[in-house]
Amino acid sequence: MPKLFLRLDLAPGHALGPGKIGLLEKVRDLGSISAAARAMKMSYRRAWLLIENLNESFDWPVIDASTGGLHGGGATLTRFGLEVIERYRAMEATAEKSVSTHIKAFERASSVKARGVRAPRS
């Protein structure tokens, strides 16, 4: 089924899309950048760089991270980080709703079937 992909280009080299939002949601749910990275099958370094890029994209940080210690470190989303997720998901829902008729038309016309096999062209 065709799916809408929403990406906001905030500035050159700074974008916000489903990958970064997914990472923020995992950090929110798991309380750790490391755990979020593992859950998303990416390196800790990659996750850290994505979060650093997000923090540089806005006037306020999206994550508040603490370094390890006796009980290890952790990360929590800032109030602004939670707002970023909320606004992105709201925009995504609004966009999907507004183009749903067109997406259904593409779905009906698509030659890609449920198993992902492309029908032969004549």
What are these regions (language model features)?
Residues 84-106:
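Alpha-helical linker/hinge and terminal dimerization helices associated
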Residues 50:
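Residues within the DNA-recognition helix of helix-turn-helix
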Residues 101-122:
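C-terminal regulatory/oligomerization modules of transcriptional regulators
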Residues 27-37:
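Short helix-boundary/capping micro-motifs
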Residues 56-61:
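Residue cluster at the C-terminal edge of the helix-turn-helix DNA-binding motif
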Residues 65-91:
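Basic, amphipathic "hinge/linker" alpha-helix immediately C-terminal to the N-terminal HTH DNA-binding motif
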Residues 1-12:
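Short, Lys/Arg-enriched N-terminal segment that forms or immediately precedes the first helix
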Residues 41-43:
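Central "turn" residue of the DNA-binding helix-turn-helix
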